[in-house]
Structures are given as structure tokens and as C-alpha cells.
Amino acid sequence: MSNYTVVKYSSEHYDEWQDFVRMSVNGTLFHEQKFLSYHDEGKFEDCSLMLYCKDELIAVLPAAVLQRGDRKVLKSHPGTSYGGLVFGTIPKLKAVIDCINAVEEYARNNNISRFEFRQAPKIFLSTPIDQIDFALVQLGYEREDQELSTCYPLIEYRDIPIEDMVKLFENDGRNKVRKNVRKAIRAGLEFRELDNSEIDKYYEILLDNLVRHEAKPAHSLADIKKLKELYPERVRLYGVFVAGNMAAGYLIFNINSNGWHVFYGSMDYKYQVERPTTFGLFMLLKTLADEGYEYLNMGISTEDGGRVVNWGLLDFKESFNGTGIIRTYWSKNL
């Protein structure tokens, strides 16, 4: 324990942090300071931490401090989908425990009385490191919430003809992926990456979708444009077009070399009969598979910390041969 030093991140550590995350065993786009920087200054009270052992950087933790009533909470950075500790190499269990203890000690010394965070999905790890979860249980952390996300293994679709890929999907139930994809192909639907001039139209469709579901976007139009500027290769927008008109769109983030995360999928409902979201997701799977990626994560289909399942949304995702992965929220009073 005495060998560990916790340093609060500042801009002078930017290059060190970036290099560490990119070379780590479990870092993602959402752990990079470059990504976190798109948020307006002052939106969050940043408390990202760097953990050193004998002057060697061992782990980093993107985080912020929240004021909840009369108590301060250290939380996985609220500006990301997931966070948690990032390690440079496969850590031994003792090192994981020591790092968590060091974070707790830092928190207590700064009048922080609770620690909450969520790890990245295991599909984005370069190697399994379940010793992190094991250490959390050993140290008294609780699984506060568990969300169910859907992911797609892509290797099966790599370098095969479109028609052969279509045959791999179900053709029964409500979604009828095989039938609807073939129908879209016959109708001449176009799938392609959007250019920057088309982002406004995409966002207009997205807002209309969210209003239908009484929801609000996590990103403003300016946010999406800024992220696209920061990461021109790792933030992509794809559209599906019917007779030249944008009918659906997907915003995806390149999490790391393992795969991508769908942040928003949306559809112009006047084209619903053409099933543009079905065709769009099918072509996303094919595109990313042919580029050599392992997984596409479609995001959660649950609400209220996993207590409520959106069965219609989950049915759509599972009809594309999707499988469930757990996103766990850990917490502990200090």
C-alpha cells in the first residue's frame, strides 16, 4: 500500500495518460482524455486519477466528483458510457486490490464518502481480467445495478458474399431479418457512410425518434460534430437511403481494436415499411466484419438499472444473432 501514489490528473499528464490507455489491456475510447475533453469546461468536476507504484504508472481511473446531498461521491466519469480502472499490463490480484485501496484512501482524504463505477464490457478487453471483479467482491463492493447489452460477434460474416450472410439470420418471428434484408436489396436501398454535410439531417431524424419515446439525446448536434472533428476515423455516421432520401442512420464509436459501439440508431418513420434500420444494422455488421473487427456492441435494452426490460427493442437486437453481455455498476460506501 505504501508503494502506491495517487495523482489527480491535470493537463500536463495528457500525453502520458493517452499513451497509457492506448497501450493498455482494457482501455477504450471512453477512457481517453482526448474523448473526455469534448465536454464543456466546468460541466463536471473532474477527478480522474493516476496510480503509480515506485514511479511507474500502473493504472488510471477516469472519474468525477458529484455532490449528492451532503456527501461527495467519486464516480466513473459521467461523460462516458463506462469507465473503471485501466491497467497497462495484466495485473496480479494483489496489485488490483492495492490500487482500489489506494483510490479509497485518496477519496477519504478528500472527504469523499462513496465510490461508484462501471467497467467496460468484457468484449473490449484484450485478455480476460476477472480479477478486477473478484477484488471488488473481496473489498466489499456491491453490484448496485446490472444492465443487459447486446453484442454481435463478427467473425462469421467476414469475407463472405452478402447472400450467404443473409442466410445466417432468422426468418421467423416479428422481425424476419432475412426477408426484410432481401426486400431492401431488391428495392435498391443504399447504405453508406455520411459526410459532414449530412450530420444535420441525421440529427433531425434522431430528435424525431427520441421525441416519440419521450427521451432526450445525450449529445447535442454540436457535441456530435465536435467528436467527429476530434476522431474523424473513430466516430462514424452511416445512413440508409430510399430513393436518395435519408431513411435511417447509425452513430458508432470505435471503442478500441476489438470493435465498435452503436450509440444511436434512428429512423424516419415515413419509410418504416422499407425496414431501413434492419438493412442498416445488417450492413453495419458486414462492413465492420470485413474490416477485421471482432465485435459490435448495440447497447442496452434495459431501464431503471436493469429492472425493466424493453422487450421490443431486445427482440429486434436478438433477431440479428445478438448475445447478451452484462454491464455492472459497482458501489461502496467508504
How does the language model describe each region?
Residues 4, 8-54, 58-70, 121-270:
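A conserved beta-strand-loop-helix scaffold within acyl/acetyltransferase catalytic domains
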Residues 20, 106-110, 287:
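Short alpha-helical functional segments enriched in proximate histidine and acidic residues
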Residues 41, 74, 306-309:
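Short glycine-biased active-site loop of nucleotidyltransferases that positions the nucleotide triphosphate
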Residues 44-46, 110-112, 290-293:
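Short, high-confidence coil segments that cap the C-terminus of an alpha-helix
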Residues 50-52, 92, 97-104, 224-334:
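Aromatic (often tryptophan-rich) hydrophobic motifs at membrane interfaces
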Residues 65-84:
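Conserved acyl-donor/pantetheine-binding loop and adjacent beta-alpha core of acyl/acetyltransferases
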Residues 78-82, 145, 312, 325:
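Short, solvent-exposed loop/turn segments at the edges of secondary structure
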Residues 79-126:
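A gly/proline- and charged-residue-enriched helix-loop-helix capping module
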